[in-house]
Curated annotation (Swiss-Prot):
It is an enzyme of class 3 (hydrolase). It comes from Aliivibrio fischeri (strain MJ11) (Vibrio fischeri). Signal peptide: none annotated. InterPro entries: RNaseH-like_sf, YqgF, YqgF/RNaseH-like_dom, YqgF/RNaseH-like_dom_sf. One of its GO terms (biological process) is rRNA 5'-end processing. Gene3D superfamilies: YqgF/RNase H-like domain. This is Putative pre-16S rRNA nuclease. Transmembrane segments: none annotated. Could be a nuclease involved in processing of the 5'-end of pre-16S rRNA. Belongs to the YqgF nuclease family. Keywords: Cytoplasm, Hydrolase, Nuclease, Ribosome biogenesis.
């Protein structure tokens, strides 16, 4: 197992959550939620985070329905976001199924912090954690 640093994003049209993790431990931590306008973040803010953490790989959650089918409205936009990350920063980017990540993130946050922990930014960042930890699990199976 390598010791790569991996960054993950949970794409949304109003907010984009992020997380960072280490492949060797398979663990991830929430970073920051970026405000977005119709899916477009402030790219300067994203750049600052990428420069600070210098990830070896970026994982972007791929929104699908419960059967794994792409969603007409949001899936293409998440793919476009992933392509822009690669184009702007030259980092390898992978898409990863994010089914049920928000539900799992809400449950995790509620368990440790109750209703007060359920802010939109916290949920989006925890969703990025769930996406990244799921990606780690897939690498090991």
């Amino acid at each position: 197992m390598s010791s790569r640093t991996i960054m993950a994003f949970d794409f949304g049209t109003k907010s984009i959550g992020s997380a960072i993790g280490q492949e060797i431990t398979g663990t991830a931590s929430p970073l920051k939620a970026f405000k977005a306008q119709d899916g477009t973040p402030n790219w300067d803010d994203i750049e600052k985070q990428i420069k600070e953490w210098n990830p070896d790989l970026i994982v972007v959650g791929l929104p699908t329905d419960l059967h794994g089918k792409e969603l007409d409205t949001i899936t293409p936009r998440a793919k476009k976001f992933a392509n822009r990350l690669h184009g702007r920063f030259g980092k390898q980017v992978e898409l990863h199924d994010e089914r049920l990540s928000t539900a799992e993130a809400r449950a995790d946050l509620f368990e440790f912090g109750g209703y007060k922990a359920l802010s939109k930014g916290n949920i989006d960042c925890q969703s990025a954690v769930v996406i990244l930890e799921s990606w780690f699990e897939n690498q090991w199976s």
